[in-house]
Amino acid sequence: MTQLKNPVLMATIGAAQGLRGEVRVKSFTDDPAALGDYGNLHSEDGRVFEVLEIREAKNVVVVRFRGINDRTAAEALNGLELFIERDNLPDDDLDEDEFFYADLEGLEAVDRTGKSYGSVTGVFDFGAGDLLELKGPGLRPVLIPFTEWSVLEIDLEAGKLVIDPTAAGLVDDEKSGPGKPFPTKRK
């Protein structure tokens, strides 16, 4: 994706809908019907898509793109991911403590002592809550829960987020580590 400097995934194209070139699209925007409000959408292979029509359907939006005029052309788009440039996202609508998930990528994850656990390489939602992927030099990627207990502070200007490594599952709690599920009380 050479055209975009800081791409943000906005949608994934699904199956064709009807005969006029419409496609079912899974939009990752707050308002799925506003997908076209962010400007042209770009694919990883460099194609540009302009939204002509959009309407809501069950769990998706149905979109007609410029230049996609028949079912065959629409079917060829199945599975295609669509991106915009990060600068096209409206920052002025955000509160002070709000951010876009795309802004988290690249932040260094540190604990309160400053020890680094790598940087954020992705944000995922597999249905049970958001997860941050951390990757450090020479380390395998790990997923940590994106919760208020695991991520204590986010500082976009400093380029870091402060985590609790125990709550994030990166280190064992000395009191209740493996083989010791609960601290025992002695009489």
UniProtKB/Swiss-Prot annotation:
Keywords: Chaperone, Cytoplasm, Ribosome biogenesis, rRNA processing. GO terms for cellular component: cytoplasm; ribosome. GO terms for molecular function: ribosome binding. It holds the Pfam family RimM. It is found in: Cytoplasm. Residues 96-169 form the PRC barrel domain. Its main location: cytoplasm. One of its GO terms (biological process) is rRNA processing. Signal peptide: none annotated. Binds ribosomal protein uS19. An accessory protein needed during the final step in the assembly of 30S ribosomal subunit, possibly for assembly of the head region. Essential for efficient processing of 16S rRNA. May be needed both before and after RbfA during the maturation of 16S rRNA. It has affinity for free ribosomal 30S subunits but not for 70S ribosomes. The PRC barrel domain binds ribosomal protein uS19. Belongs to the RimM family. This is Ribosome maturation factor RimM. It comes from Rhizobium meliloti (strain 1021). The lineage of its organism: Bacteria, Pseudomonadati, Pseudomonadota, Alphaproteobacteria, Hyphomicrobiales.
